[in-house]
């Protein structure tokens, strides 16, 4: 049985995927897990491959949700994206963009989502 934190994270990822779909993105993968890391959402939008990390925080302490994606986490995301591109050569020709979606109050009456495009560069 998932913990309350895991359930909130899953809800945040569901909301983020719906948000991206509504914005015209084609969702290719959700929770793409490999040995080197995990990608929350992989989508195609306007000729780009969008690798989206979903974050949920109830407080802006320590810089908020987006600030929690440190260099080490960026490296894991980049490595997992590289694995995906090796397995899917049809996607390898597309420019890759790393975005962050910050979900606030996922169970509230009106959850909000902040979409930070080009949140970080591949490392």
Question: For the regions a protein language model found, what residue spans apply to each?
Answer:
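Short glycine/proline- and charge-enriched loop/turn segments
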Residues: 1, 57-61, 116-117
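Acidic-basic catalytic patches of nuclease active cores, encompassing PD-(D/E)XK
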Residues: 1-30
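Hydrophobic "anchor" residues on beta-strands that sit immediately upstream
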Residues: 26, 49, 95
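Secondary-structure boundary/capping motif
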Residues: 30-31, 53, 114-118
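Short acidic/glycine-enriched loop/turn segments that link adjacent beta-strands
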Residues: 35-37
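Conserved catalytic cores of phosphodiester-cleaving nucleases, focusing on short active-site segments
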Residues: 39-64, 69, 77
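Mid-chain, well-packed structural core segment of small domains
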Residues: 62-96
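Domain-level recognition of nuclease-like catalytic cores that cleave nucleotide substrates
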Residues: 87-123
């Amino acid at each position: 049985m998932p913990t309350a934190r895991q359930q909130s994270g899953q809800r945040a990822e569901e909301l983020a995927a719906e948000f991206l779909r509504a914005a015209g993105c084609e969702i290719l993968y959700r929770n793409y897990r490999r040995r080197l890391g995990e990608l929350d959402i992989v989508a195609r939008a306007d000729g780009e491959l969008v690798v989206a990390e979903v974050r949920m925080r109830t407080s802006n302490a320590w810089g908020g949700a987006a600030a929690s994606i440190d260099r080490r986490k960026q490296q894991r995301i980049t490595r997992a994206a590289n694995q995906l591109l090796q397995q899917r050569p049809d996607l390898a020709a597309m420019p890759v963009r790393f975005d962050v979606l910050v979900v606030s109050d996922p169970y509230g009456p009106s959850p909000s989502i902040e979409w930070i495009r080009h949140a970080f560069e591949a490392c």
